[in-house]
Amino acid sequence: MTQTFDPSAFLATCSGRPGVYRMFDAEATLLYVGKAKNLKKRLASYFRKTGHAPKTGALVSRIAQIETTITGNETEALLLEQTLIKEWRPPYNILLRDDKSYPYVFLSDGNYPRLSIHRGAKKAKGRYFGPYPSAGAIRESLSLLQKTFQVRQCEDSYFKNRTRPCLQYQIKRCKGPCVGLVEPEVYAEDVRHSVMFLEGRSNALSDELNATMEKAAMALDFERAAELRDQVALLRRVQDQQSMDGATGDVDVVAAFVNPGGACVHLISVRGGRVLGSKNFFPQVGIEEEVGEVMSAFLAQYFLGGIDRELPGEVIVNVINDDFPAFVDAVEELRGVEMVISHRVRGTRARWQQMAVTNAEQALTARLANRQHVASRFEALAKVLGLEDPPMRLECYDISHSSGEATVASCVVFGPEGPIKSDYRRFNIEGVTAGDDYAAMHQALTRRYSRIKAGEGKLPDVLLVDGGKGQMSMARDVLNELQVPDLILLGVAKGTTRKAGFETLYLNDAAHEFTLPGDSPALHLIQQIRDEAHRFAITGHRARRGKTRRTSTLEGVAGVGPTRRRDLLKHFGGLQELSRASIDEIAKAPGISKKLAESIYANLHSE
């Protein structure tokens, strides 16, 4: 591919029809994907001599080739553009980082249905409510329902194997259907009330509960009346918090806000007239820094990005864009949903719109302030380390285990804008003496920097090791063994009091020992990164330890692989319950023969 690009020659043969264009640099790297109603006019605008934003100028300076694809109309161009952006994620495009399916509340079938969080395909029989904008929003609803109507939320395998009520019953979060402490018709009524709440019929539910409460009081059933009174009080509290309610239907309210430091899109989800929650998105802003372009890119990626989201009939936005008609047509063509985009709204919808705008502005302001705060800490650390410029990349390692069991090493990465979580790594440590933190750290660093030397990953400017002189010396040995280019090695050890603010630091070699004042921004950054490495190591260790304890006793049984182990534990509700089962009971589990049941039983009772 040639490194020079002649815009005049290219535009002379460029079509004026709708389509998609792709810009490449001299190394054939895709830089940007765009769409246009008129390809020739749109592409010509890039090569005007004046009026470009800095990022557009940077893009144009790197163009070595442009490829175009003509489409039948703008809608086809939009769909193709989104497909290419999702596949290639070009650096100059606006990119939406969040790519997870959105959660629903799932109500299972059966005599004693269960409420739970669900993501992914809707295969299980039951009812789905949502989608909710975040897991936090859905947990709030489930917590309220658990307090108010005490519908169970435990796994079916756990429910089927209970012989006495669990802690949830003791704290009045469940009525104990697992051991027959509630009549089926009473439980069914609680489920019906939960459904009314999830459908957004809170007012009708409150009226019904009030009427039932009055009847109970008239019948002198004061205990039941008090229970209903508490339920009504909880519902009213939620209704007060959801003061934005007051309309019907399914609506997403989307507000975009842009300033020179970045962009934020705030989304509020309304289903059945009830606000389910909200979420902030911080898209990677490409060359389009106008708020309308950010909004257009967000809507296309969010609603057409390949995730099977349940689409609302209306989207309220705070800014309009010429691409919206093509977007609406694309939604109908691809998803079969007739969607309306509203901009000028009144009443309740206007309040939703304004709240979304306010939240977008505040979220971006807070994010940029935090980014500036972290950057100032990096500058302070640079002074401590004697660097002319702040380091751009810090890595920190920590080890977690329980008396040598399930040892896990963590690696967290920070930059001037904060944690770079996509670069976090965990290492399951094998083949070292139980409890030998030095050997565990040696293995983790060797594995990590061997990969970096092989071209997998980036070398940090500063390597932060949570430990004293011993860990520092070991880390230096690893770097020397692998001939890793010079980088700054910084060790942090707790002081004699083991309190925050009294840490001892070691720079490059264990002989260079110093401390920092408790109010030092550089020390605060070191503490933040160390604590994050500690957290990441502990969560990994707990997950590994839990998995080991759940499955290790079955791993030696011939014919019991990972899938069968999982199904067995799910059928019996856990390893403890499986251990109590007889051979005949084990043989009744799906896919388990009498002979295999005997082997499983013998393995569980071998000691």
Swiss-Prot record:
Domain UVR residue range list: 203-238
GO cellular component, one term: excinuclease repair complex
Example of a GO MF term: excinuclease ABC activity
Superkingdom in the source lineage: Bacteria
Pfam families per record: GIY-YIG, HHH_5, UVR, UvrC_RNaseH, UvrC_RNaseH_dom
Gene3D superfamilies: 5' to 3' exonuclease, C-terminal subdomain (1.10.150.20), GIY-YIG endonuclease (3.40.1440.10), UVR domain (4.10.860.10), UvrC, RNAse H endonuclease domain (3.30.420.340)
Primary localization: cytoplasm
Gene Ontology terms describing biological process: nucleotide-excision repair; SOS response
Subcellular location: Cytoplasm
Record domain GIY-YIG: where: 16-94
SMART domains: GIYc, HhH1
Record keywords, A-Z: Cytoplasm, DNA damage, DNA excision, DNA repair, Excision nuclease, SOS response
Family statement: Belongs to the UvrC family.
Primary role: The UvrABC repair system catalyzes the recognition and processing of DNA lesions. UvrC both incises the 5' and 3' sides of the lesion. The N-terminal half is responsible for the 3' incision and the C-terminal half is responsible for the 5' incision.
Quaternary organization: Interacts with UvrB in an incision complex.
Name this protein carries in UniProt: UvrABC system protein C
Species: Pseudomonas savastanoi pv. phaseolicola (strain 1448A / Race 6)
Gene assigned in the entry: uvrC
